[in-house]
Amino acid sequence: MRFSILDSRFWITRCRAERRGVACDAQRGVQVAIEGVASDAPTGLPGWLRALYPFTPRSFATPRGARMSFLDEGPRSDEAVLLLHGNPTWSFFYRDVVRSLAPTMRCVAPDHVGMGLSEKPSAKNYDYTLAARIADVEALVASLGLKRVHLVVHDWGGAIGFGFATRHPELVGRIVILNTAAFPDARIPARIALCRAPLGIGSLIVRGFNGFAWPATWMAMHRRALTRDEKRGYLFPYDNWGNRVAVSGFVRDIPMSRSHRSYGTLAEIERGLPLLTANPKLILWGGRDFCFNDHFYNRWREIYPDAAAHHFPDVGHYVLDDGGDEVREKITVFLRNAQG
C-alpha cells in the first residue's frame, strides 16, 4: 500500500475539521460518575446515547486499581457470553448483540481500561500492554464467579480474549471470531503505521487530532455509512487528549518485532491456540477490512479448519454495524445453541 505525505495532510485536515463536530461531542461528566463507584455506574449518559445504548454499566476495580466499566445484562448465571472489543471501539460496538442475547443469556461486555466509559489513567499509572489487558479480563471473570464463558472477540479483543482462553481453556465454551488476530504478523496498514510515528508525531495524530477513532467511523464501513448518532456513540468517550490515552496505547502495543514488549505474550497465545481446537467456533468476516484483511481470515481457516465460517465480501471492519442483522442473527443462533 502506498501512502504519501499528501495522504497524511488530507487525513489530519479532516480530523482537525471534525474535532468541532461529532468528534467533540464530549463525555461530559461520565468519568467523574465512574470513579469510586462499586456497582452500577454511570448515570450521566445523554439521551441520544441511551437510546442506542440502553444499559446500566457497572464498575470493577482491576488488579492495578483502575476502574473498568462493563455491561452485565441478562439472567444471573455462572455462564455468560463475554464480548471483548478492540481499538478504537468500546462496548457500544456490541450494543445490538447484547440486546439480542440478553433475554435468555447473561452478557458481560467490558470497556478495557482507558476505553469507553472506563477510567483513563495516564501511561504512568497503568501498563497499557496486552498482558495487562488479559489480567484485567481474568480478574473480571473471577470477580463475577463465572464458571463458563462463550467468547465474542473483535480487533484487539481477539488477542485479549484468546489470551484469556488459552490460559483458562476449561472455562471456555463457544467462540465467535470477528475480524481479528491472535498471532504475530508483520503486516500493518500504512495509516496505522503513521499513527505509530516517532518524535511525538503518532501521538499528535491519535491524541491531538483524534486521527484514529474518527477516521474509523468511515474507514471501517463499506456497505453503509454510520448514522450521525452512531458516529457520536463511537467517539463519545474520546473527546480530548487525555481520554485518547488508550487509543494511542493500543496502537503502540502492536508487536511488529520480536523485541517489542508484547511480542512474547502474543507468541505465547499463538502457541496455545491448539488447546481450543475442539471448541465450537463461528468465524464472521468482513471482506472490506482495511486492517484485518483476508490474509487474517485465511490464517484463521488454517488454524481452525473445522470452524463454521462466513465471509461477507462487502462488509468493513465494523462488521456488526456494516453487516447488520445478517451477521447478528448468525451470532445469536450460534450462541443460543450452547444452551442446548
Give residue ranges: language-model regions.
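Arg/Gly-rich low-complexity intrinsically disordered repeat tracts
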Residues: 2-12, 20-21
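Short hydrophobic alpha-helical segments enriched in small aliphatic residues
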Residues: 25-26, 41
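Flexible "cap/lid" subdomain of the alpha/beta-hydrolase fold that forms the substrate-access gate
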Residues: 33-59, 66-68, 73-75, 80, ...
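Short amphipathic alpha-helix adjacent to the substrate-entry channel of hydrolases
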Residues: 93-107
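Catalytic histidine-centered segment of alpha/beta-hydrolase-like enzymes
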Residues: 315-328
